[in-house]
Amino acid sequence: MKVSLFVTCLIDLFYTEVGKATVELLERLGCKVDFPEAQTCCGQPAYNSGYVKEAKEAMKQMMRAFADADYVVTPSGSCAAMLKEYPHIFHGDPEWEAEAKRLAAKTYELTQFLVDVLKVEDVGASLHGRATYHTSCHMTRLLGVKDAPLRLLEHVKGLELVPLPNAHQCCGFGGTFSVKMGPISEQMVDEKIGHIEEAEADYLIGADCGCLLNIGGRIARLGKPIRVMHIAEVLNARN
C-alpha cells in the first residue's frame, strides 16, 4: 500500500523524531511511504488569523503536491482536520473545488489510518510505565477521531493506560490563542498539568505536536518529572 506522508510544520521544525517514527511504523506494517517534497503548510495558521488569500495559496500548493497520492497520512489531528476543511473553503471554486474534495477524501490522521484502513490495533509496540492520553480539540471535535488512539495504546505491551481527568478540556494552545491570550493560556495549561499529575502518569501521550509543545514546554519550565511523547513514538517503541 502506497502512503504519502504529510509531515506538518511543527514536526518538520521541532519534532523530526515523530516524522521518523511515523515512517518506520508505517513501513513495518507493510506500507510503502513516500514524501512529496513540494508539500508546505496546510494553511491553518494564516486562515485562522484572517489571512484567507494567503492561506489559499498554501492550500493550492498542498493539493498540487499530493495530487498523485493514494493515501495522505499525517501524525497530526489538527492538520488532518484542516485538509478535511478544504472542500468547504473552496466551495464554488470551479478550478479547485474538485481537487479539494479529492485531497480531503484520501487524508487520514495516523491512528485513524492504522485502525480504519489497515485494520490494525496491535502494532507490536512495548513501553513500560504508567501513561495517560491527551486528545486535541481539533482531533476530537473537528476530525471526530476519539477511540482509535486509545485502542492502539491499550495494546502496547508494558504500558499501563490510565484515564486523564477532564481529558477533552483544551490545553490552552489553540495556535495563536496561546500568543494573543497568554495569561489565559497559561492558566489552562497549568490546569491540564494538574490533571496529568492527578493521574500519576510517567508519560503524557498526545497526537498533536501543538499540544505537546505547549504542555511539554510548561512541564519543563515547572520542572515536573513527566515525559511527553507523541503517539507515533509510543507505537514505534520497543522498550
From Swiss-Prot:
Top-level lineage group? Bacteria
UniProt GO molecular function: oxidoreductase activity
Provide one Gene Ontology cellular component.
Answer: cytosol
One Pfam family assigned to this protein is: CCG
User: Can you cite a GO biological process for this protein?
Assistant: lactate metabolic process
Give the disulfide map.
none
The UniProt similarity line reads:
Belongs to the LutA/YkgE family.
| Entry function | Is involved in L-lactate degradation and allows cells to grow with lactate as the sole carbon source.
Write down what this protein is called.
Lactate utilization protein A
Organism per entry = Geobacillus kaustophilus (strain HTA426)
Designated gene of the protein? lutA
